[in-house]
């Protein structure tokens, strides 16, 4: 099983629409670990996803649409070396 790590920036109407909580649920359902947080610009959500490549891809596919009420305008994915550093999936404070 190939493991993967993606550093993701999702832009658009993605704050105030339960994006972080929804992403956490989707990630946990797919066995993906990492974190998600809002950025202080008010229009960006940032996440790091780690897990089996197929599972990470499922979360990324979901993130292109997001939860009801979201309007994703752009998604930037930076593939990084898998580190296996997370035990679960967390919602972190805004930066």
Swiss-Prot record:
InterPro entries: Acylphosphatase, Acylphosphatase-like_dom, Acylphosphatase-like_dom_sf, Acylphosphatase_CS. SUPFAM superfamilies: Acylphosphatase/BLUF domain-like (SSF54975). Residues 5-93 form the Acylphosphatase-like domain. Keywords: Hydrolase. Gene3D superfamilies: 3.30.70.100. The active site is at 20, 38. Its EC number is 3.6.1.7. It is an enzyme of class 3 (hydrolase). This is Acylphosphatase. The gene is acyP.
């Amino acid at each position: 099983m190939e493991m993967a790590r993606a550093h993701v920036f999702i832009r658009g109407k993605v704050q105030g629409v339960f994006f972080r909580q929804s992403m956490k649920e989707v990630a946990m359902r797919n066995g993906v670990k990492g974190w998600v947080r809002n950025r202080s610009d008010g229009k960006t959500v940032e996440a790091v996803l780690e897990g089996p490549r197929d599972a990470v891809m499922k979360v990324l596919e979901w993130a292109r649409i997001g939860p009801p009420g979201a309007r994703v305008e752009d998604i930037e994915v930076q593939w990084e070396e898998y580190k296996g550093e997370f035990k679960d999936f967390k919602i972190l404070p805004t930066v």
